[in-house]
Amino acid sequence: MSRYTGPRHKLARRLGISLDGTGKDIKRNFPPGQHGHNNRRKLSEYGIQLQEKQKLRHMFGLNEKQFRRTFDNASKMAGVVGENFMKLLESRLDNLVYRMGFAPTRPAARQLVNHGHFLVNGKKVNIPSYRVQPGDVISIREKSRGLQLIKDALEGRTFLPNYVTFNDAAAEGTFTRLPDREEMPAEINEVLIVEFYSR
């Protein structure tokens, strides 16, 4: 299954969740379409699990193959599978570029990483799925510091998670530790996703 490339605001309304973290994509809290107000069908148990999976998958902008591979990796780790899964997603380079405020949205962060604008511990990394380790430092390449998209995003940043620190003078952030569950998206019930893949 390929990555969704259609209108994200329509997808957000269909899933009932903000995909970009701003809430602007879900101002109208009902599904798109002529009968959106009356189109909230009662979902089966499978439908509820599937919808939860789709929420998280589209939130991070992954295709099914990438998403499932991350879940399988989480299943092999010690601890709670659902929380491990969320932590692996939060540890992605594109997500941390977004969390640190280098980009206004995850899709924008993914594109910036793809174009080679960031360094991890001083080395260029252009793989959005790169797994950042606690203690790793993410910075902007010298020749990319003048990019207006990055400058505007940093100036507009209003929140910084507790599991990252940011040096404004150096324009670099450090992933200090893996996030606790309460620091990850509260609108996601990862237990339903574990149940979906355990069917």
From Swiss-Prot:
Q: Which InterPro entries match?
A: Ribosomal_uS4 (IPR022801), Ribosomal_uS4_bac-type (IPR005709), Ribosomal_uS4_CS (IPR018079), Ribosomal_uS4_N (IPR001912), S4_RNA-bd (IPR002942), S4_RNA-bd_sf (IPR036986)
Family named by the database record: Belongs to the universal ribosomal protein uS4 family.
Q: Which UniProt keywords apply?
A: Ribonucleoprotein, Ribosomal protein, RNA-binding, rRNA-binding
Descriptive protein name: Small ribosomal subunit protein uS4
Q: Where is the S4 RNA-binding domain?
A: 91-154
The record's function comment reads: One of the primary rRNA binding proteins, it binds directly to 16S rRNA where it nucleates assembly of the body of the 30S subunit. With S5 and S12 plays an important role in translational accuracy.
Q: Which GO terms describe its biological process?
A: ribosomal small subunit biogenesis; translation
Note the PANTHER family from the entry. 30S 40S RIBOSOMAL PROTEIN, SMALL RIBOSOMAL SUBUNIT PROTEIN US4M
List, in alphabetical order, the Gene Ontology terms for molecular function in this entry: rRNA binding; structural constituent of ribosome
Its Gene Ontology cellular component terms are: small ribosomal subunit
Self-association state and partner proteins as the record states: Part of the 30S ribosomal subunit. Contacts protein S5. The interaction surface between S4 and S5 is involved in control of translational fidelity.
